[in-house]
A protein has these predicted regions:
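Charged catalytic and DNA/RNA-contacting regions of genome-maintenance
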Residues: 1-326
Length: 326
C-alpha cells in the first residue's frame, strides 16, 4: 500500500498534482482518468485499484513529497477498452481531459472533467447488447411510498411509476434489471436487502445526496427540460414521489453526461397494476429471458419467441416478455 491521497499535504504537492487532488475531491466516488500527454494516468488509491483490476503495472511518480505517488496509466487511444472493463466491474470513471494544446501553453495545462461514465450511462455500443436496454433506475422512498424513474439514455426511454410496498418495488427492479440504481438515503433504510440486490442483479447501487431529491428542484428541473408550465402537462399530476425520483435522476444524468440530454424528449408515466406481477423466483424458474444454469438466452422463452429482425424489435420483444399485460 503506497501513500494515500487522504494523508497528503496538498501544499507540498507539485501544481499538477494539486490540481489532480482538487479534481479527485469533486469526484470521490469515481476513478479519475487524468490526461497527461498521450496517456490517462491514475494516482494514489485509484492507481492501486486500476492496476489490480486491469492487471497493469503499478509504478510511482514524483509529486513534490518525499515518497512517490502510486501511478498507473493507459494509452488514450485505447482508453475505451480499459474503460469498458472497469464499467463492467461496476466502477464509475470520471474523464479529465486536456482543454489546451500543451505545446502552445505556458505553465499548467487547463484540464477539466468532460464526462462521467457509469454502468447505467455508458454510450459505447461495443460494450452494450443492442438487443436489450441499458437501464438506469432512480428510487426514492418518501412517506411509505416508492417513486421510481427508469431511463435508457441510448434509446431515449424515460418512464416513471409509484408503488406502495416492497414486493412491488422489487418486481420493478427485477423486471427492468437496471445496470445502475441511484436512490435517497431513506431507501437504504427501508428494509430492502441492499447487498442481496446488488449481488443477485450485479447492479451498481449508490445513494445520492439529499439535495438531489428536493421536491421543488425536481419539479422545476422536469418542467424546464420538457418546456411545460405545470406537471399536469407531463401527465404527472398524481405522481409526487415519481416526480422526485425522475428529477433526481435527470439531475444525475446532467452532471455525469455534461450535456443537456435533449434526446430525452418524453417522460411516460405507467401504472404497475396494468401488468402481470412476477416475482424474482418466478422469473428465474420460468426462464423468461435466460436459463437458470448457464444464464444464457439460448433455451429461454425469449430465445424461442424472438424472430425479430432489428435491435429495436428485439428490445420490444424482451419488454413484452418481461412485462406482460394483464
Amino acid at each position: 500500500m503506497g501513500i494515500s491521497i487522504k494523508n497528503v499535504d496538498v501544499s507540498s504537492l507539485s501544481p499538477m498534482m494539486q490540481h489532480y487532488v482538487k479534481t479527485k475531491e469533486e469526484y470521490k466516488d469515481c476513478i479519475l482518468f487524468y490526461r497527461l500527454g498521450d496517456f490517462y494516468e491514475m494516482f494514489f488509491e485509484d492507481a492501486e485499484v486500476v492496476s489490480k483490476e486491469l492487471e497493469l503495472t503499478l509504478t510511482g511518480k514524483d509529486c513534490g513529497m518525499s515518497e512517490r505517488a502510486p501511478m498507473c496509466g493507459i494509452p488514450f487511444h485505447a482508453a475505451e477498452v480499459y474503460l469498458n472493463r472497469l464499467i463492467s466491474k461496476g466502477y464509475k470513471v470520471a474523464i479529465c481531459e486536456q482543454m489546451e494544446d500543451p505545446k502552445q501553453t505556458k505553465g499548467i495545462v487547463r484540464r477539466e472533467v468532460i464526462r462521467v461514465v457509469t454502468p447505467g450511462t455508458t454510450l459505447n455500443t461495443q460494450a452494450l447488447d443492442e438487443t436489450k436496454n441499458n437501464y438506469i433506475m432512480s428510487v426514492v422512498y418518501v412517506s411509505n411510498r416508492f417513486g421510481i424513474a427508469i431511463a435508457d439514455i441510448t434509446t431515449g426511454v424515460f418512464m416513471v411509476t409509484e408503488v406502495d410496498d416492497v414486493r412491488k418495488l422489487l418486481d420493478e427492479i427485477y423486471k427492468f434489471s437496471p445496470a445502475e440504481l441511484v436512490c435517497n438515503e431513506a431507501f437504504t433504510m427501508s428494509g430492502i436487502e441492499i447487498d442481496e440486490l446488488k449481488n443477485r442483479l450485479n447492479i451498481s447501487l449508490s445513494a445520492l445526496d439529499n439535495w438531489y431529491f428536493d421536491d421543488d428542484l425536481c419539479a422545476r428541473t422536469l418542467k424546464e427540460h420538457f418546456h411545460v408550465g405545470t406537471l399536469e402537462g407531463l401527465g404527472l399530476k398524481d405522481y409526487n414521489c415519481a416526480v422526485i425520483a425522475a428529477g433526481a435522476l435527470f439531475t444525475y444524468l446532467l452532471e455525469t453526461q455534461k450535456n443537456s440530454m435533449e434526446h430525452l424528449r418524453q417522460i411516460t408515466p405507467y401504472i404497475t397494476d396494468k401488468y402481470m406481477l412476477i416475482d424474482s423466483s418466478t422469473r428465474r424458474n420460468l426462464e423468461l429471458t435466460e436459463t437458470m444454469r448457464e444464464k444464457a438466452k439460448r433455451g429461454s422463452l425469449l430465445w424461442v419467441l424472438d424472430k425479430t429482425k432489428t435491435a429495436m424489435g428485439a428490445r420490444m420483444m424482451r419488454s413484452f416478455i418481461e412485462q406482460p399485460l394483464i
